[in-house]
Amino acid sequence: MIGPWRNLCQQHPYWVALLSGFLVPLAYAPVLILPLFYLGFGTAFYLAWQHSEHLGRLFRLGWLFGFGQLFLGLYWIGEAFLVEAEIFLWLLPFAVTLLPAGLAMFSALAFFVFGASLAWLGRAPSRSLSPPSSKPLSRLAALLWLAVLWSLAEYGRATILTGFPWNLPGMAWGSWLYLAQPVNVLGVHGLGLLALISVSLMVSKTRYGWHGGLALLAAAFVYSGVTLHTLGQVAGAQPSLQILVVQPHLDQREKWLPSKRQDHIEKTFRLTQAGGLAGFVDVVAE
């Protein structure tokens, strides 16, 4: 960790955890600043390692980090309350805070189980902010275990009570065509685990940690390139399929008005006709 940033982590861990959470959504579409994924998760994992002997503190750090990324990543939920704002606007603050607060319990649980499992093994780091590298459970092994626990927590968030799979770690790589292709074998949760393993390697402070993290990125890039090249050859051998996507972009305040129904239908047909002038369209998606 860079010196000033490390000092902030030591002096104000809770604020840093929250700020790190704010960084992560900026790695996803549409902003796509991938290094912020590594800075955000790298800082969170660093904090988890440094405070792994204090379960209550770990729980709070995990919750703040999760709340930060979900609060910023779910800002769009508030837009729904601006439709008929005179009725629903008062609910907006509750929606944009309570939902992230509840979902952040999954990340808090991941951090808590991380600390509890290290304590159970009798290998939690000392209270020193510089854990010795000679511990039975190395920093690298602990951080890799945290990557697994975080992935399990994200899977739980994506499935329990119908799930809410938003801003999963796999979406950081999945937003880049030449990193996303392992998803065809591993799924989005497996892709996220790979991304988090690369974070763990980079934060591990082992001799080849950074090299290992970059090598994992490079492997995903090569696999994606080979996959896309293969798919391109297969697609080139098949007849082309023309797909037209129509988005009428209706005003939400008018979308369900019975008096506007015919106008909406006619607009959709006009757009479909205009889009299909260049040739025959096989599929129309609205």
Regions flagged by a language model, labelled:
Residues 2-231, 265-269, 273, 283:
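Membrane-embedded alpha-helical bundles of multi-pass enzymes
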Residues 226-286:
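Soluble catalytic regions of membrane-associated enzymes that act on cell-envelope
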